[in-house]
Amino acid sequence: MNTKYIFVTGGVVSSLGKGITAASLGRLLKNRGLKVSIQKFDPYINIDPGTMSPYQHGEVFVTDDGAETDLDLGHYERFIDESLSRNNNITTGKIYWSVISKERKGDYLGSTVQVIPHITNEIKSRVYKVAEGKNIDVVITEIGGTVGDIESLPFLEAIRQIKYDVGVENVCFIHVTLVPYLKKSGELKTKPTQHSVKELRSIGIQPDIIVCRSEKLISNDLKEKIGLFCNVERDSVIQNLDAENLYEVPLMLHREGLDNLVCKKLKLQCNETDNTEWIIMVDKIKKLSKNVNIALVGKYVELHDAYISVVEALSHGGYANDANVNIKWLNSEDITKDNIEEYLKDIDGILIPGGFGDRGIEGKILAAGWARKNKIPFFGICLGMQCALIEFARSVLKYEGAHSSEINPETKYPVIDLMPDQKDIDEKGGTMRLGKYPCKLLKNSISFKAYGEDVIYERHRHRYEFNNIYRDELIESGLVLSGTSPDSKLVEIIEIKEHPWFIGVQFHPELKSRPNRPHPLFRDFIKASLNSKHKFD
């Protein structure tokens, strides 16, 4: 079977949920026995989001092969339960970088390099590359931004051309749009959708399916109207209502017939959709009987997308323990010695996620100390582990002023220091320790009991590491180095001997958690937090 291509565009406004729509469709097609891959085209000129502020972009999602990518790739991985790669997130910056590099090498000798055909050909090659050598049945490509944006035009032109390059029977265009509800008149309005599709058609793309985001039910009459003005059949107008839980969306879209429409359009030879496992999972999520309160202590807490994979992984841990996870978002800048008890008195577990820089660092260190002293389950990720280590060195070893050399280059006790292979690197973008690395676990440690394996593989994104100069005295004072690189040179996991559940990890376990396969550390962190809750009840 030829590889089929599905392109998901968006209209009217951004943040409509194109990524969730693409991920949900991917799940439905996988449930039909098809091999699916999903990619995202981002129209910004940055090479990747690695140097962008979380306030601008949200979380940076890291793949196994070390690519810093859009947070939508996290949704894709969680929904289709497949590990993606750097080929699954392409930016305008990458496209132009590649074309200009080829021009400098003389690959276009004699030609005037232009948007068409050189940029569009490069874009098309990235679409095809996802499926190369992998026997992929369906490639779903989300086009970032909104139809009408200048930045998106080369991508839209490229996918218009692909339809004729590979054959119209091998391409399906899905347009996600907004049908707003006006409370004053009590009406849903279709005009924004009509204009969005008109804009798309003006550049040569006729959508095959229109997915309408709405907070109210869309009547058959309205679907008929949208179909008439947008040149699609009524049955090809799909409503996508707001859902209480993201993982309900595939089932909602299946009930609307989205996957059937796609299979019919692409003439896909596949099984009927078997959503049994997904239905069981969603039903379980709806019936969770326990509650657990987790403090997430960070500096971007007003923008939840900055920690989206952590939030999802906490929820997955809750699913495995029949528990709703209630997150208390705490800005680490607000935490002081005088008010920490007020902030954390009703908390069952404390999590400090990754991050960079000195803003709010002392509040994170205080939170780690509170968890250590009060035997509250603690989970520190990347910078969160480093904060726990700094607090331990200050309080237990009495190393006054102990710190990370990232935050205080003049500290007398740099218990966290720049990795040796990072010291001669000047550029910021894509130069950290990135991607999947092995980690050897200490037998009988909390981490080993969680994983049940001798060697694990986790994804990293950092420049600073545990300083081995202090290894012996930290171990003698009760710190357990439960995970290291295979050569034992890099400390990847720390625990505290006399604590029921205190773990810091240098990697990012949240990136590998799935709703149907919760990450073992998040699963056990929630379990320990539930036990802590009962203890203090």
Curated annotation (Swiss-Prot):
State the family it belongs to. Belongs to the CTP synthase family.
Identify the GO cellular component terms for this protein. Answer: cytosol
Q: How does it assemble?
A: Homotetramer.
Protein name in the entry:
CTP synthase
Q: Which reaction does it catalyse?
A: UTP + L-glutamine + ATP + H2O = CTP + L-glutamate + ADP + phosphate + 2 H(+); L-glutamine + H2O = L-glutamate + NH4(+); UTP + NH4(+) + ATP = CTP + ADP + phosphate + 2 H(+)
GO biological process, alphabetically ordered? 'de novo' CTP biosynthetic process; pyrimidine nucleobase biosynthetic process
Which Pfam families is this protein grouped with? Answer: CTP_synth_N, GATase
Positions that bind ATP:
15-20, 72
GO MF annotation list: ATP binding; CTP synthase activity; glutaminase activity; identical protein binding; metal ion binding
SUPFAM superfamilies, per this entry?
Class I glutamine amidotransferase-like, P-loop containing nucleoside triphosphate hydrolases
Q: Which residues form the active site?
A: 382, 508, 510
Other known facts:
CTPSs have evolved a hybrid strategy for distinguishing between UTP and CTP. The overlapping regions of the product feedback inhibitory and substrate sites recognize a common feature in both compounds, the triphosphate moiety. To differentiate isosteric substrate and product pyrimidine rings, an additional pocket far from the expected kinase/ligase catalytic site, specifically recognizes the cytosine and ribose portions of the product inhibitor.
Q: Where does CTP bind?
A: 14, 149-151, 189-194, 225
Name the segments for region: Amidoligase domain: 1-268
Q: Which principal EC class is assigned to this enzyme?
A: ligase
User: Keyword set for this entry?
Assistant: ATP-binding, Glutamine amidotransferase, Ligase, Magnesium, Metal-binding, Nucleotide-binding, Pyrimidine biosynthesis
- PROSITE patterns in the cross-refs: GATASE_TYPE_1
Q: What does this protein do?
A: Catalyzes the ATP-dependent amination of UTP to CTP with either L-glutamine or ammonia as the source of nitrogen. Regulates intracellular CTP levels through interactions with the four ribonucleotide triphosphates.
What gene is behind this protein?
Answer: pyrG
The entry marks the following residues as binding UTP, namely 14, 189-194, 225
Superkingdom as given in the UniProt entry: Bacteria
Name the EC number(s): 6.3.4.2
* Amino-acid positions noted as binding Mg(2+) in the UniProt annotation, renumbered to this chain: 72, 142
Glutamine amidotransferase type-1 domain location is 293-535
Q: How is its activity regulated?
A: Allosterically activated by GTP, when glutamine is the substrate; GTP has no effect on the reaction when ammonia is the substrate. The allosteric effector GTP functions by stabilizing the protein conformation that binds the tetrahedral intermediate(s) formed during glutamine hydrolysis. Inhibited by the product CTP, via allosteric rather than competitive inhibition.
Pathway named in the protein's UniProt entry: Pyrimidine metabolism; CTP biosynthesis via de novo pathway; CTP from UDP: step 2/2
Show the InterPro entries listed in the entry. Class_I_gatase-like, CTP_synthase, CTP_synthase_N, GATASE, GATase1_CTP_Synthase, P-loop_NTPase
